[in-house]
Amino acid sequence: MASVHPTAIVEPGAQLGANVTIGAYAFVGADVTLGAGCVLHHHATVEGYTQLGPDCEVFPYAVIGGRTQDLKARPGKPGLKVGARNVFREYVSVHLGTQEGEWTILGDDNTLLAYSHIAHDCVIGSHLVISSHSAVAGHVHVGDHVNIGWNAGIHQFCRIGDHAMVAACSKCVQDVPPFVIADGNPCETKMINVVGLTRAGFTPDEVATAKTLHRLFYREGLNASQALEKARTLPEASGRIVQAFAGFAAATKRGLA
C-alpha cells in the first residue's frame, strides 16, 4: 500500500505501485505510473506521461517528466520511460519527448546529481553518473557505465559510448567513443579510461587492446576511415573491445571527439 503525505497532490489517474512513499507537498500527475517502492521526497514533482520503474528515488525540487523546451513541440502526449533504481537528486530535471509517440528513455541504476538535466528524446543506458550542473541536450544517446563530470555540456545528437568518462567542464560537440576519457572545450579524447575498465572487470589484455585502438585513432596520423580499416585487421578484431569501438566509430555522424 502506498504512503502519501496529506499535503501531497496525487492527481486522479496516477498509478502507484506497492510500497510507494510520497512526501510532503510532492506532486504526481494524472498520467504518471510509479513502480513499486518508489520514494518521492518532499516537494518532488513527477508529471507528464511518465513511467518510473521500481525503487526510484526523487529528491526535493526535482522535476521528472516536465514538458520539453524544444520549440518544435506540439500538443500531444510524448513520454518518459525510466527503469529501476534511478536516483534523481535535488533540482534535477528530466524532460519528456518532443512529439506524440516519442520518448525520453533512461535505463536502470542511473544517478543524476543535483541540478543536472536530461533533455527531450535522449536515450540513456544504465549505470550513468552525471555530476551536478551538467546538461545533456536533446536526442543524445549515452551508453552504459558512463561518467559525466561537473558542469559538462553535451551537444544535441551526440553519442557517448559505454564506459566513457567526460571530464568536468567539458563541452562535447562530437561523439565520445567507448572506453575513453574525454576532456576540454571543445571536448577531445585524451586517453583510455583504464581505472574504469579495470573496475568493470575488463582483463589486462582487453585494456591493452583499448590502448591500441586509441593509438590507431589518435596517435598515428590516420584519418577515421583508415584507422577503422586497420582496427578491423587486428588480431583482437573479434573481441568485444574492438567490436564495440569499431562499431561506434563506423556509425558516427558528427565525427569522433
Task: Name the predicted role of every residue range.
Residues 1-7, 12-13, 18-19, 55, ...:
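Terminal amphipathic alpha-helical/low-complexity segments used for targeting or macromolecular assembly
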Residues 2-183, 187-188:
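Structural signal for interior beta-strand "rungs" in well-ordered beta-sheet cores
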